UniProtKB/Swiss-Prot annotation:
UniProt source species: Homo sapiens (Human)
Pro residues biased stretches: 655-666
InterPro entries: Zinc_finger_trans_reg (IPR051061), Znf_C2H2_sf (IPR036236), Znf_C2H2_type (IPR013087)
Keywords: Acetylation, Activator, Cytoplasm, DNA-binding, Metal-binding, Nucleus, Phosphoprotein, Repeat, Transcription, Transcription regulation, Zinc, Zinc-finger
Motif Nuclear localization signal per UniProt: ranges: 133-138
Gene Ontology CC terms: cytoplasm; nucleoplasm; nucleus
Cellular location(s): Nucleus; Cytoplasm
Name the UniProt record assigns to this protein: Metal regulatory transcription factor 1
Gene from which this protein is expressed: MTF1
Length: 753
């Protein structure tokens, strides 16, 4: 600034403001030779006069007047002093320092000629008593009635008085803004908010922060120097970078509320001025904050309310929306609600991770091992999940869930093992083709849906029960490839109304999975099958000594369902999309919209053979939902007739006498099953095997491989899931623990029979 001045003096000037420390408030002058005006360093009086070119230079936004932002600051360097605020170089100064041995007077007109019409000057007086060394600064009192505000400079007082007169004459011309300010400088600073300009950068090594005003930079630098404003109240350790913020905080201890609303006798008082401004808008109806989103015309009285509203737009923009666009109600796009996002992964994510999986093929895993792992005591080892998968899903679902619990990272490879189960909701509409998909890893029972439209039936759908996470036996090591078990989209196939899964004779897990989840391509002949039974051998387990086999059948009991999955009919069809083994029609597949299939994965640790590291396996259980007409759910002759027809069919297919009849699905319309052969893997190109026909399957059910296959074969699916039947108490304590809150939930079926 002194570059063009007559005496070539360079001035080191710091603003006189309340937010500066006493050392910062000292005005220091050094000539170009670096000589201090007083040899003793003692200063009796300093006076600074700032010649202003425009009326007022700073809007008083804070309670105590953050002044001095408009002043030109000169900061010291190793080779001298240089000017920071180039916008204020045209302003002139008259300054003098009174010391014991000299009086130093400096007149600096600025880098440009002094203005002819000087509209005002800011006078700062700071005195130091020679005896006590105390510094005293004159305060300027506001003369408006009832206003207690004081300022250290006359210019700041004058700016403050404009607020009483409402002289907000400097208006922002940025599109959609329209804010007005007391001074031109305040407007210039505000425009930097729109332009993102931050010319004042922190020079501390490693700190890359920048600010739009020098005042904010100096406040920030106090964090580096440690010269913060600390609260001295007992038990309070808070500190602040500005004196104004400290004074606001102290009012929380004293209870002082100096800002009172005088609107129509309101009388409410506040500790901060901006709280009063916000309150006044409740009287005036002013809503100055507009939502910038396209098509949204909402306005708000506070910036906080606007930010909260904008988060809603952000969440909608980033929400997981893999649902196809239908011509139906738009509400179906948001009807899929997930309770535990950490259990969910998409088809593409599993395919991306498939290259990292190693180990055996699924065809080498026996059904006995699968069921043994499902019911082994979960206390043997800790349950872990893949945090990377959880994090990616949390980001995709950040609009649908509040939080996802953190879990320890897995230390081994992960894989996905698919077990298909059957869910049969009865509908009053005609049967529709099946679209298999993936769903939570739980064997959900079949709810009974009352008559009505499909939309009504799925408007209040049953929830799905999540199973316990159970470790796999120590004697077995699992490693499955995600890509081998990902179902591909295929044209829909009709499904048997009464399909059930029974634990019994031997069959491979892959064959069972495809038998339930993936019908084969249609052949020339079809045969109506009212019911089909597939058996699985169950490994020996101390927990299952009394219940060696498992039968999953439809049940009228829907009270055990917990609300964790809610979906509309169109979303249901999307969830059930494409799990059959081979494509039926390439043209139909090309025309079908490409969507993601969702897998709910529970990671469980697998104890490998001695000397090997522990691996992780994801148990991903697709649930097939079979739509059928309204079925009778009562224990009457119609249910018995269905059992008799199934029994007579088994007799016609095999000579051995039938075993104890297991509960069958309620009688419904006979659906045509195109073929009785099923692929062992749903992905083309993988190894496949052919399941026996329904006669052979029945024969397998009649010859169980374990002597313990007697009691559980007739277990109802409600008893299997809840294991809290009043008649048959269960020994499977880990699964019972999941249902302890069932009665508290007060869940009742909302579907009429």
């Amino acid at each position: 600034m002194g570059e063009h001045s007559p005496d070539n003096n360079i001035i080191y000037f710091e603003a006189e403001e309340d937010e500066l420390t006493p050392d910062d408030k000292m005005l220091r002058f050094v000539d170009k030779n670096g000589l201090v005006p007083s040899s003793s360093g003692t200063v009796y009086d300093r006076t600074t006069v700032l010649i202003e070119q425009d009326p007022g230079t700073l809007e008083d936004e804070d309670d105590d007047g953050q002044c001095g932002e408009h002043l030109p600051f000169l900061v010291g360097g190793e080779e001298g002093f240089h000017l920071i605020d180039h916008e204020a170089m045209s302003q002139g100064y008259v300054q003098h320092i009174i010391s014991p041995d000299q009086i130093h007077l400096t007149i600096n007109p600025g880098s440009t000629p002094m203005p002819r019409n000087i509209e005002g000057a800011t006078l700062t007086l700071q005195s130091e008593c020679p005896e006590t060394k105390r510094k005293e600064v004159k305060r300027y009192q506001c003369t408006f009635e009832g206003c207690p505000r004081t300022y250290s400079t006359a210019g700041n007082l004058r700016t403050h008085q404009k607020t009483h007169r409402g002289e907000y004459t400097f208006v922002c011309n940025q599109e959609g803004c329209g804010k007005a300010f007391l001074t031109s400088y305040s407007l210039r600073i505000h425009v930097r908010v729109h332009t993102k300009e931050k010319p004042f950068e922190c020079d501390v090594q490693g700190c890359e922060k920048a600010f739009n005003t020098l005042y904010r930079l100096k406040a920030h630098q106090r964090l580096h120097t440690g010269k913060t404003f600390n609260c001295e109240s007992e038990g309070c350790s808070k500190y602040f970078t500005t004196l104004s913020d400290l004074r606001k905080h102290i009012r929380t201890h004293t209870g002082e509320k100096p800002f009172r609303c005088d609107h129509d006798g309101c009388g409410k008082a506040f500790a901060a001025s901006h709280h009063l401004k916000t309150h006044v808008r409740t009287h005036t109806g002013e809503r100055p904050f507009f939502c910038p989103s396209n098509g949204c015309e909402k306005t708000f009285s506070t910036q906080y309310s606007l930010k909260s509203h904008m988060k809603g737009h952000d969440n909608k923009g980033h929400s997981y929306n893999a649902l196809p666009q239908h011509n139906g109600s738009e509400d179906t796009n948001h009807s899929l609600c997930l309770s535990d996002l950490s259990l969910l992964s998409t088809d593409s994510e599993l395919r991306e991770n498939s290259s990292t999986t190693q180990g055996q093929d699924l065809s080498t895993i026996s059904p006995a091992i699968i069921f043994e792992s499902m019911f082994q005591n979960s206390d043997d080892t800790a349950i872990q999940e893949d945090p990377q998968q959880t994090a990616s899903l949390t980001e995709s679902f950040n609009g649908d869930a509040e939080s996802v619990s953190d879990v320890p990272p897995s230390t081994g490879n992960s894989a996905s093992l698919s077990l298909p189960l059957v869910l049969q909701p009865g509908l009053s509409e005609p049967p529709q083709p099946l679209l298999p998909a993936s769903a939570p890893s739980a064997p959900p029972p079949a709810p009974s849906l009352g008559p009505g439209s499909q939309q009504a039936a799925f408007g209040n759908p049953p929830a799905l029960l999540q199973p316990p996470e159970v470790p796999v036996p120590h004697s077995t090591q699992f490693a499955a490839n995600h890509q081998e078990f990902l179902p591909h989209p295929q044209a829909p196939q009709p499904i048997v109304p009464g399909l059930s899964v029974v634990a019994g004779a031997s069959a491979s897990a892959a064959a069972v999975a495809s038998a339930v989840a993936a019908p084969a391509p249609p052949q020339s002949t079809t045969e109506p099958l009212p019911a089909m039974v597939q058996t699985l051998p169950l490994g020996a387990n101390s927990v299952l000594t009394n219940n060696p086999t498992i039968t999953i059948t439809p049940t009228p009991n829907t009270a055990i369902l917990q609300s964790s999955l809610v979906m509309g009919e169109q979303n249901l069809q999307w969830i059930l999309n494409g799990a059959t083994s081979s494509p039926q029609n390439q043209e139909q597949i090309q025309q079908a919209s490409k969507v993601e299939k969702v897998f709910f994965t529970t990671a469980v640790p697998v104890a490998s053979s001695p000397g090997s590291s522990v691996q992780q396996i994801g148990l991903s259980v697709p649930v097939i939902i079979i739509k059928q007409e309204e079925a009778c759910q009562c224990q009457c002759a119609c249910r018995d007739s269905a059992k008799e027809r199934a029994s007579s069919r088994r007799k016609g297919c095999s000579s051995p006498p039938p075993p104890e009849p297991s509960p069958q699905a309620p009688d419904g319309p006979s659906l045509q099953l195109p073929a009785q052969t099923f692929s062992s893997a749903p992905v083309p190109g993988s190894s496949s095997s052919t399941l026996p026909s329904s006669c052979e399957q029945s024969r397998q059910a009649e010859t169980p491989s374990d002597p313990q296959t007697e009691t559980l074969s007739a277990m109802d699916v409600s008893e299997f899931l809840s294991l809290q039947s009043l008649d048959t108490p269960s020994n499977l304590i880990p699964i019972e623990a999941l249902l302890q809150g069932e009665e508290e939930m007060g869940l009742t079926s909302s579907f009429s029979k």
